[in-house]
């Protein structure tokens, strides 16, 4: 009788462990991007394995939600940067995520877009004034670096050169 009970208990424990293992392997496959879906662990047993499965399932669902949230922001970032590449600087990232690093990246991209759009608008404004024969205003070079600084200096030099020609 003891041997039969031991065998039955062993089978139940081994079966529960195998179910738990399969669920974890499915989750790790999802985390490692080997699978696009994640399966929850079987939490139907009324023992410690069922309790552990419930805790793990809660965390799988939280992690899955977070990963999907991150993917949506990454997809939106790719789309927005594709528009930037074509010259549309009005685009911004709008999705909010719980991942602090991705939120910081979102803010950096949006701030960069704001700054570049403002600087390009400043250049266009001055060029529009030049086309109306008004060469008095200049582009501020404060806080500009490299290419934007060269662009602003180039436009300012153009205005100075035209003014010198007219004098």
Regions found by a protein language model. Name each.
Residues 4-167:
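Polar/charged heptad-repeat coiled-coil helices used as signal-transmission/dimerization stalks
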